[in-house]
Amino acid sequence: MDLQAQLEELKTKTLETLQSLTGNHTKELQDLRVAVLGKKGSLTELLKGLKDLSNDLRPVVGKQVNEVRDLLTKAFEEQAKIVEAAKIQAQLDAESIDVTLPGRQMTLGHRHVLTQTSEEIEDIFLGMGFQIVDGFEVEKDYYNFERMNLPKDHPARDMQDTFYITEEILLRTHTSPVQARTLDQHDFSKGPLKMVSPGRVFRRDTDDATHSHQFHQIEGLVVGKNISMRDLKGTLEMIIKKMFGEERSIRLRPSYFPFTEPSVEVDVSCFKCGGKGCNVCKKTGWIEILGAGMVHPSVLEMSGVDAKEYSGFAFGLGQERIAMLRYGINDIRGFYQGDQRFSEQFN
């Protein structure tokens, strides 16, 4: 077969093969292009035969070769478009949407368990006549420590325990500074002060299952005339019963806080076992829940309140601890990791 006939045969067979390729034959199309038009393809092999032709025939066949190459190149380009279009259409068909189907129900958000706990606690205090007072998270050393009867050399002022921004500015380690500022402003001629101050506080703790460098506290303060330890105990009993049930009881253990004197740790009878002893209460029947005490006279005097005429009590509890006890949560880090699987349990 002469070279011209071979060129015609190559053109015809290639065009026929191209027509059979669809959207499922992208690789086959590329392989065919290389086999025909590639550097080692069929057309290149035929070109090698030009040297054996006569001088008269060589230009004629050379022109035919170029025409065949141009024709096949264009044919491959057109078929590639067809193959790609067919591929896209097949994908669209496979992913078609039935517009008559009902839409998916929108996922509803809900309050975080800490928000729920905080609101429940605040509602309890509002019902008892307390006012809610917010304060600064970035606080002065003076209000955070000195006004709370914490002298310069107190261990709690150590850099290991507190996030200092400057020597005089820090991230508050408790919400007590709000109480100091409120004491400065309160007009006792209009009645006693009853307040709680909820909010985030910060400590230089290593995060683990029971510790976090930030957590939430709610601290309470009552100051007026003839406020006694009996008032503190009665208030705490009412709070605990509203939080954990009317059958709960409390006990007070001696403790120490620089800003209260006397100071107590407050335990609640275990709501899991009813005081019989279990893993939650560590077999004691009691769970440590908060710290409290009578406001130290120095704290009152620094606010210009006559400690001989006025007295008061203060208490503080951690909202994470309350939530962990109420819902059986054993790792404080779950509150902050944003895992919806954790959060939706409390919806």
UniProtKB/Swiss-Prot annotation:
One of its GO terms (biological process) is phenylalanyl-tRNA aminoacylation. GO terms for cellular component: cytoplasm. GO terms for molecular function: ATP binding; catalytic activity, acting on a protein; magnesium ion binding; phenylalanine-tRNA ligase activity; transferase activity; tRNA binding. Keywords: Aminoacyl-tRNA synthetase, ATP-binding, Cytoplasm, Ligase, Magnesium, Metal-binding, Nucleotide-binding, Protein biosynthesis. InterPro entries: aa-tRNA-synth_II (IPR006195), aa-tRNA-synth_II/BPL/LPL (IPR045864), Phe-tRNA-synth_IIc_asu (IPR004529), Phe-tRNA_ligase_II_N (IPR004188), Phe_tRNA_ligase_alpha1_bac (IPR022911), Phenylalanyl-tRNA_Synthase (IPR002319), tRNA-bd_arm (IPR010978). Its EC number is 6.1.1.20. Mg(2+) binds at residue 261. CDD domains: PheRS_alpha_core (cd00496). Its main location: cytoplasm. It is found in: Cytoplasm. Tetramer of two alpha and two beta subunits. PANTHER family: PHENYLALANINE--TRNA LIGASE, MITOCHONDRIAL, PHENYLALANYL-TRNA SYNTHETASE. Belongs to the class-II aminoacyl-tRNA synthetase family. Phe-tRNA synthetase alpha subunit type 1 subfamily. This is Phenylalanine--tRNA ligase alpha subunit. It comes from Streptococcus pyogenes serotype M18 (strain MGAS8232). The gene is pheS.
